Amino acid sequence: MKQGKTLETLGAELQRQRAARQDFVADTRHLNFYTEDGKSRLTLTTGNKLLEFGVNPLAHQQISARLGIPLKYYQRMQTEAPALLDENVNNWLQQSPERRMLRVMDGNVRAFLSDRYRRLDNLELCAAVLPIIQGMKGAVIESCEVTEAHLYLKVINRKMKAEVAVNDACVII
């Protein structure tokens, strides 16, 4: 892993993300997918409000998988026939109604998940894991990073490094 953020900058980013995130559980019949200026958009009708979001690459993959549209074909429609993609996605959203959770960050759908998905954010995860890491003798958080899809913590346990020598047989259980 490349050198990433310090724990302090990671904490600040996770706080920012917590304030910027939104989760919506919606019936797929209240969703509309369209392309504008080469960018995919997803609208959600809630009561008398119309919410509009961009769609990030991971959400595209999840939409493709959930609707049973092969990813290569989905991506080809994105670039070569966006109107066809819009029609396909909207057709399957209407024809196969179900409740889905939309995870939104900074105005973009970043995940298209089951409505039963446990809502756990990176800040909660760090709050649970960091005390355990800090309690490990010799453990040092070397680097951390957060992306749209992943949280990375590089932890080096200097005590273990001193006990395990090169060419020692190790078994991971």
Regions found by a protein language model. Name each.
Residues 1-128:
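Feature for intrinsically disordered/low-complexity regulatory segments and propeptides
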Residues 119-173:
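Intrinsic disorder/low-complexity polar-acidic segments
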